[in-house]
């Protein structure tokens, strides 16, 4: 896959100052990578692969855990003194924003997150991670510590020839609105959920 680096800039945030790098696929799809600290290629890099979630990341939705995970991942990277966030433009697990709204409507009517996708004619998860290899290669990184609950992300990187030396769960944001969503991700999509995430809210 051809993924080209375009440009970079400083990105000051309330957590600290990151460097933001822009990448574009041949298809025109854009992705960004935020780095913090000095990237040393011979050292496993703490990273998060985060797929775009407008509702969670920008609109503070409590229907998912995405926004909570984004914030926590950046905090962990800053605390570690070094790391990167790959922000991938594949909204709604790859089905797009409008279809995500349709899926949410179906969930309002009783479907779970997997059933909603299937009723719309989609697989439960259409995301891909092939763009991550050239993005990481831009920094000569081939060993990572991955912040994720999703074993498919671990396997995807391994399939790309990237060594995942550690999977670090990022279990945050459980609330009354996303409790069943998190249950479904654990039970039907294989996500790691512990610390009472599967217990009843009390």
UniProtKB/Swiss-Prot annotation:
SUPFAM superfamilies per record: RibA-like (SSF142695)
Enzyme class, broadest EC rank: hydrolase
Cofactor note: Binds 1 zinc ion per subunit.
GO annotation, cellular component aspect: cytosol
The protein's annotated pathway: Cofactor biosynthesis; riboflavin biosynthesis; 5-amino-6-(D-ribitylamino)uracil from GTP: step 1/4
Pfam families reported in the protein's UniProt record: GTP_cyclohydro2
Binding site for GTP: 48-52, 69, 91-93, 113, 148, 153
Source organism, top-level taxon: Bacteria
GO biological process, one term: riboflavin biosynthetic process
Cofactor requirements of the protein: Zn(2+)
Catalytic activity: GTP + 4 H2O = 2,5-diamino-6-hydroxy-4-(5-phosphoribosylamino)-pyrimidine + formate + 2 phosphate + 3 H(+)
Enzyme Commission numbers on file: 3.5.4.25
InterPro entries: GTP_cyclohydro_II, RibA, RibA-like_sf
Catalytic residues as annotated in Swiss-Prot or TrEMBL: 125 (proton acceptor), 127 (nucleophile)
Keywords: GTP-binding, Hydrolase, Metal-binding, Nucleotide-binding, Riboflavin biosynthesis, Zinc
PANTHER family attached to this UniProt entry: 3,4-DIHYDROXY-2-BUTANONE 4-PHOSPHATE SYNTHASE, GTP CYCLOHYDROLASE II-RELATED
Function: Catalyzes the conversion of GTP to 2,5-diamino-6-ribosylamino-4(3H)-pyrimidinone 5'-phosphate (DARP), formate and pyrophosphate.
Family statement drawn from the similarity comment of this UniProt entry: Belongs to the GTP cyclohydrolase II family.
HAMAP family per the UniProt record, alphabetical: RibA
UniProt name for this protein: GTP cyclohydrolase-2
Species whose genome carries this gene: Colwellia psychrerythraea (strain 34H / ATCC BAA-681)
